[in-house]
């Protein structure tokens, strides 16, 4: 199977890995930088505390993303870089998860709501991550096979940030 032009193991083999909050094998195991949205309306705030509460309610021990970027561009880190996340099963052992606040318009429909501050912060973060993990592909959650029919991150991550 190919993702972003990269050959990966079968989805069945990826699913066999347990996502348990342990560390990944090495920096070389990072193959994807996955952009997510919080799937919240652009006119409503979604704090780190709300995100944490919602992720714990889903059975995660904490926030599943490595990074969360608020509408004002404030970024918080919630997992160590080589810690297995909980954001894109079955790809958690080979990816870094980045979530931006938003993704829905005022009516609750999928929409690219990335603010200029978020765009700048995401670009800065991805530039650093690409230096650390040069082989990693920048993709949206919806671009990973087996995760459809998701619309997340409600934009074309590869087109916006993959250059």
Identify the meaning behind each predicted range.
Residues 1-34, 38, 42, 71-75, ...:
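Basic/polar, cationic surfaces and motifs that engage anionic cell-wall
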Residues 60-61:
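Short solvent-exposed loop/turn micro-motifs enriched in small/polar/acidic residues
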Residues 47-55:
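Short Gly/aromatic-enriched secondary-structure transition segments
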